[in-house]
């Protein structure tokens, strides 16, 4: 969770017109939870700005220590790390990048840690037996960003939360000395869910892949290693929340929402050639109308599969009730929720998505 000004009510002046407590600004919120399998979770550090910075420092320390422990025991391991890397509130006096924006400066610290991981793998003597993947987050939040932060659109349109390519397409690299040839540039489609299936295959753990649900990931081992030179995936369905927003097939894309004039007639203009129009600003009705039937068939097959294997329901309940070290203000969140539920004229559960 990224820290924004509203999450720190103590930084704001007293508002004499506030009628509710806590009102819109959260109180007692939990920033980070840590835990182990089979155990209850606990809050890490707290919710201060100092704790926000400490998340990455502690995560990096634990990542290196975990690698060292398993290398010493000659055991295979899997590590996933999603750094905070950008502090919205921390003053930044020194500009470490030529760009000078808050995001480019934050990349410098992240880049240093990536180098530390690669160096440690070599020091431990396991680089040739380890697949290392680094990839970006989808985003950034390009709509009305703070000035000077470099949260700007580049080649693709959109940002975090969008179904346009700027909100879903990210750069990535895979490094495996002796197994993946250097200096390759691959333009194939790989979905993040493919990493699950691919890692299971490379790690000899396919027998642990669940058989009681649909696994979206496609095995991309042959793309990474010598052999088949192309991805086993040429399509992707893109959602906004629980709404199917777009479908990509190869270089072509169909928008299902925001389809513009003519949509109600069944002839939508929202077909795009991503090679020619990466910003998805010039829909091509006439040149691409022959794709209409095929895209509609893809959507119907997808919807039919979801009827057989529906999405899991969202979790409901009192938040943070199981934390072993919950603060009084955190526990108050659950108590307040119960009071508000009891005061409602009817059950709110049936209105929850």
Identify the meaning behind each predicted range.
Residues 1, 72-79, 126-132, 168-170, ...:
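Loop/turn elements at helix/coil->beta-strand transitions in domains of secreted/extracellular proteins
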Residues 1-75, 83-92, 266-269:
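Formylglycine-dependent
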Residues 5-11, 140-163, 180-184, 188, ...:
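C-terminal cap/loop subdomain of S1 sulfatases and analogous C-terminal strand-loop tails that border
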Residues 7-8, 79-88, 134-142, 217, ...:
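Short, solvent-exposed turn/loop segments enriched in Gly/Ser/Thr/Pro and often Arg
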Residues 36-48, 93-98, 175-179, 278-281:
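Short glycine/proline-rich turn/loop motifs
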Residues 64-68, 111, 118, 122, ...:
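Non-transmembrane alpha-helical segments in soluble domains
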Residues 89-106, 112, 119-179, 191:
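Histidine-centered active-site microenvironments of extracellular/periplasmic hydrolases
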Residues 260, 265-270, 274-353:
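Long, internal low-complexity/basic segments
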């Amino acid at each position: 969770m990224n820290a924004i000004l509203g999450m720190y009510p103590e930084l704001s002046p007293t508002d004499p017109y506030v009628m509710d407590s806590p009102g819109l600004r959260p109180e007692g919120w939990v920033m980070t939870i840590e835990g182990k399998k089979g155990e209850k979770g606990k809050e890490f550090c707290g919710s201060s700005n100092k704790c926000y910075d400490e998340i990455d420092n502690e995560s990096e320390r634990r990542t290196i220590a975990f690698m060292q422990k398993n290398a010493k025991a000659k055991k295979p391991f899997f590590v996933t790390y999603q750094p905070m890397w950008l502090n919205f509130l921390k003053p930044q006096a020194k500009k470490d990048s030529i760009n000078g924006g808050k995001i480019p400066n934050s990349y410098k610290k992240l880049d240093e840690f990536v180098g530390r991981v690669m160096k440690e793998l070599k020091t431990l003597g396991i680089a040739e037996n380890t697949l290392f993947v680094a990839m970006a987050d989808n985003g950034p939040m390009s709509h009305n960003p703070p000035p000077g932060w470099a949260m700007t659109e580049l080649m693709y349109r959109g940002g975090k939360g969008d179904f346009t390519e700027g909100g879903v397409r990210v750069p990535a690299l895979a490094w495996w000395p002796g197994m993946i040839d250097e200096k390759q540039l691959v333009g194939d489609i790989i979905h993040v869910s493919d990493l699950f299936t691919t890692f299971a295959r490379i790690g000899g753990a396919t027998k642990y892949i669940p058989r009681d649900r649909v696994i979206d990931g496609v095995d991309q081992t042959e793309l990474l290693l010598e052999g088949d030179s192309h991805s086993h995936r040429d399509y992707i369905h893109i959602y906004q929340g629980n709404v199917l927003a777009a479908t990509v097939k190869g270089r072509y894309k169909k928008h299902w929402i925001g389809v513009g004039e003519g949509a109600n007639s069944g002839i939508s203009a929202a077909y795009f050639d991503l090679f020619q129009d990466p910003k998805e600003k010039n829909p091509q009705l006439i040149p691409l109308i022959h794709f209409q039937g095929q895209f509609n068939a893809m959507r119907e097959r997808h919807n039919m599969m979801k009827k057989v294997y529906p999405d899991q329901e969202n979790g409901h309940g009192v938040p943070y009730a199981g934390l072993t070290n919950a603060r009084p203000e955190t526990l108050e969140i659950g108590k307040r929720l119960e009071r508000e539920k009891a005061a409602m004229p009817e059950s709110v559960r049936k209105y929850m998505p």
